[in-house]
UniProtKB/Swiss-Prot annotation:
Swiss-Prot/TrEMBL keywords: Ribonucleoprotein, Ribosomal protein
Domain of life assignment: Archaea
UniProt-listed Pfam families: Ribosomal_S13_N, Ribosomal_S15
Subunit structure as annotated in this protein's UniProt entry: Part of the 30S ribosomal subunit.
GO biological process, one term: translation
PROSITE patterns for the chain: RIBOSOMAL_S15 (PS00362)
Protein name: Small ribosomal subunit protein uS15
Gene Ontology CC: one annotated term: cytosolic small ribosomal subunit
Annotated source species: Methanospirillum hungatei JF-1 (strain ATCC 27890 / DSM 864 / NBRC 100397 / JF-1)
Gene Ontology molecular functions: small ribosomal subunit rRNA binding; structural constituent of ribosome
The keyword Signal belongs to this UniProt entry's keyword annotation: no
Amino acid sequence: MARMHARRRGISRSVRPYRTQAPEWSNTDKEAIIKQIVDLRRQGSSTAEIGLVMRDKYGVPSVKLATGKKITQILRDNDLASEIPEDLRNLIEKALGMRKHLAENKRDIHNKRQLMLTESKVRRLVKYYVSSKKLPKDWVYKPETAEILLSK
């Protein structure tokens, strides 16, 4: 399949093996895993970082197989989930960084183009999250107020 904003194909990569239960060698102590996820979140880690730490440091290849819940669901149950989904937050941070760069470098046309592409991805994601009711119906991305949104 092709990339979204390029005229080239995607890259091949490995695929996680299909499993219905956690492997025998993995750490499957449900309460300890949930406690560790909550602790990592309180330290300021994102859900992606939590997943990497759980895999690399604690030997949990899939939190969902070990606990029956995804990381975001565990965080929601403990009132630690963020209001804005992580992928949307990352794209907004990227767009903010580009806007700051363009404020100092007004003639950087390549970065202007990248900003347009990134903000179109943001709008597309917002449309999806509003339709799937993960964001309120009146939620709109505005570059002027984006920094305030991320500080919450």
